[in-house]
Amino acid sequence: MKRAIVACRGTADRVVLKEREVYHGAHSCRIYATMGHLSSGCTDGCIGYGDCMAACPYGAITLNKNQVAVVDPAVCIGCGLCTTICPRHLISLQEKSDVAEVSFVLCHNTLTGKRAKDACANTCIGCKRCVKVCPQHCIEVIDNVAHIDVSRCVGCKVCMGVCPEGAIYPLAWVDPAERRRRMDRVAVR
């Protein structure tokens, strides 16, 4: 069983939101990204026009108050349509783990240190603290962003405790009965 995860949290003070206020083009993530709109903020985060939301035939994706895509794990069936539509490749399908709750990095920002923090308040700064403390050795930093192999994560959450930016979150799986209950509600809409 798979489900989609968006590797971005964004913030209410995101530079992208401010820049979108002066953008007068089509309200599409793909068009916004294709135009090469220059950003002084995170150029790897969710653009927030909801192309993924429109692509999801199950209504599993919404935009939160920060205009960042969020997937409802109880409604997502793991079809993968959203993964192909995101121009910044923020959405991935994650396989269900044997562990009830694993750790996941909700960031895709490739900037480091201060530059990363200036771009977004919820960023991974690539400090590698999580790599050093992981007892399962399932974390690596690639392009200045920590990546956790959820198939090897045991859910100890040691990495969450040492992350100075709070970029690592628990990824819980919804039980099949709850998924069916929520899917029934979606079908009624």
Regions from the PLM with identified roles:
Residues 1-69, 73-75, 80-133, 162, ...:
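Ferredoxin-type iron-sulfur electron-transfer modules and their immediate structural context
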Residues 129, 135-147:
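Strongly charged, low-complexity linkers/loops
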